[in-house]
Amino acid sequence: MRFRTAILLALTAALAVGCETDDPAGPDISNEGPLYIVHSALESPDGRVNYFTATNTLASGELDYGHSLTLMGRPRLYAQEGLGYFAVANAEDVEITRYTIDDEGHFVAGDTISLHHHGVRSLGAQAVYFASPTRAYYKDPNEAQVIVWNPEEMVVEKTIDLPASLIRENRVTSFGDWVAREGEAYFTVGWTSQTYDRVDPGLALVRIDTTTDEVTITEDDRCRGIETAANVDGTLYFFSGVISPFGYHVYGNDGGQPDCILRIVPGETTFDADWVGSLAASLPDGTAATAATVDENGRVWVQVVDLSTAPSAEGTTYGEWYAADWTWWHLQVPGFDEAVRAPSAAGAYSSFTVGTEDAFYISQTASDYSETTLIDLSGESAVPGLNLPGFVLDIVRIR
């Protein structure tokens, strides 16, 4: 494999450095145009080696780990375009460090805050919403709380306690995606079995006024297992995740339900009581669907599984469900119509996506996780993009 030498060199360098590099972010990094941070990883005999790498494009090229920020363990990337900085979380030590990239392309570490004293036991992916350069919210489903912190001064300002009833015995409490409008941010709360094969009925909607930090919680019994959320022209859409149709396919109503969509229209702060949407009506019969993301053109990108080949026996695991024949489709919001199958072969379920103004990428990873290529599915044919050693965990545009 063409990256074999690069992989060995990258692992050797990472283990020798132990933590991070002082090398520039890259000789070809431009101070103009888009800038992305790619979080990827390689498995080594000493554990997972993580790389945070700056790049100006996702459309082509090979990622060079010789200039990456390198960390062991299970770190997280927290970032948002336009802030001028990003944060890397140490999941084991529950610490968050602020980083910038200087004019010469160096990663510059700033201050660090610890969430350990606030009861946080581990740091989740995509758990932070940046309301402004000086105000961020970390959602913690393990302790039913939201931690408010200042990313510029790197201090915790307060902890917002959510009702203890959101944590259910013998269930995994899950917080869905952040989605926001001016002055307010939302996420949903759902509950799955500890084996991730059933989803409890109903959900809770958490709304935070980002000016006053006032919290409002409402319940809804029409959908369950909401994960993906998006703001499309001021209307907030909430889509059920992959476990709910899995549970329904195996256990019926006791395990889940077909895909389900709720919305909050402009000017309102709770779900529209007169509207429930679905992806299924526009997709082929005999399939189940789950939304992955909504792109900048108002298309919801969906993974669709062929139920004739998906396992349905009692005791089927989510891993077996993920390994079924999944294809990529996109539908147009707000009608959830104009269904188009993307130019890709059927394969295993993958939740990774990243969009730009003119492309939509999924990841194609080797069976041994040694190499990954981003694949643009936005056109009539699949187009290979950025190639990298190992597997990709997250990509965020910071400029």
Task: List PLM regions with ranges.
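Post-signal peptide N-terminal segment of secreted/secretory-pathway proteins
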Residues: 51-148
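Repeated scaffold domains used in trafficking and secretory/extracellular systems
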Residues: 70-82, 118-129, 167-178, 221-232, ...
